[in-house]
Amino acid sequence: MTDENIRQIAFYGKGGIGKSTTSQNTLAAMAEMGQRIMIVGCDPKADSTRLMLHAKAQTTVLHLAAERGAVEDLELHEVMLTGFRGVRCVESGGPEPGVGCAGRGIITAINFLEENGAYQDLDFVSYDVLGDVVCGGFAMPIREGKAQEIYIVTSGEMMAMYAANNIARGILKYAHSGGVRLGGLICNSRKTDREAELIENLAERLNTQMIHFVPRDNIVQHAELRRMTVNEYAPDSNQGQEYRALAKKIINNDKLTIPTPIEMDELEALLIEYGILDDDSKHAEIIGKPAEATK
């Protein structure tokens, strides 16, 4: 069973937004602050713990269960490894692409962890969830009330914001039955125009906060090449301080809300307001024309 005092959080976001990188760097900073943490990777790529473990990919619960014949044949120490600053690391895994339900791994892994006492002596459990889908098995941490606080990693790019709004819609669906709440938007900067201001505006419309703006810095890629978090690779760097600031905000966050997702028309109007999209009067004129022709 799960201790009621544990804060169960989840990171969602569009595929490729840097969700796993952002979550691992933030959780590493939280561990530095003395928080006892377990990461449960809920992405079939099994990349949610690699920076913590200095590894390519951790062996997943589903992979080992398939080898043994059943998840009941596994031992906890086989699927739960210890990484940076004592962070416990588990990857749920998934089936081969195109075969079966990838969300099944999440359900199997969480049930196994609960039944085998993995949630003991923890302050935080973090679920790192695949891409922009909040349906089926991937919604399981939300639907079953496992994750109580959701943090959406986004940016000033249109599709990242579109995904954030869709995820907010999924949270709203289960907010009353499962008690899940939105903890805030994390802007993982892509250096688009007026990005921080844009995400602040989106957050307000979604009835939440931009909990932190993470600037773009090449040191993140340098650390990733070494399979390390920034906090471990370059602890005194400015980027390391950004992740520590975000970590502190999550630890102290008490602004947990039921989101108010917006319609596509309102999202497009917001993008037009900030110059990401052209307004309708110009839209028809620029469709299919190269940049030179629209100057």
Curated annotation (Swiss-Prot):
The keyword Transmembrane helix does not apply. SUPFAM superfamilies: P-loop containing nucleoside triphosphate hydrolases. ATP binds at residues 13-20. CDD domains: NifH. Binds 1 [4Fe-4S] cluster per dimer. Belongs to the NifH/BchL/ChlL family. GO terms for molecular function: 4 iron, 4 sulfur cluster binding; ATP binding; metal ion binding; nitrogenase activity. Pfam families: Fer4_NifH (PF00142). Its cofactor is [4Fe-4S] cluster. The modification ADP-ribosylarginine is found at residue 104. One of its GO terms (biological process) is nitrogen fixation. Disulfide bonds: none annotated. Its EC number is 1.18.6.1. PROSITE patterns: NIFH_FRXC_1, NIFH_FRXC_2, NIFH_FRXC_3. It comes from Trichormus variabilis (strain ATCC 29413 / PCC 7937) (Anabaena variabilis). Homodimer. The reversible ADP-ribosylation of Arg-104 inactivates the nitrogenase reductase and regulates nitrogenase activity. This is Nitrogenase iron protein 1. It catalyses: N2 + 8 reduced [2Fe-2S]-[ferredoxin] + 16 ATP + 16 H2O = H2 + 8 oxidized [2Fe-2S]-[ferredoxin] + 2 NH4(+) + 16 ADP + 16 phosphate + 6 H(+). InterPro entries: NifH/chlL_CS, NifH/frxC, Nitrogenase_Fe_NifH, P-loop_NTPase. The key enzymatic reactions in nitrogen fixation are catalyzed by the nitrogenase complex, which has 2 components: the iron protein and the molybdenum-iron protein. [4Fe-4S] cluster binds at residues 101, 135. Keywords: 4Fe-4S, ADP-ribosylation, ATP-binding, Iron, Iron-sulfur, Metal-binding, Nitrogen fixation, Nucleotide-binding, Oxidoreductase. It is an enzyme of class 1 (oxidoreductase).
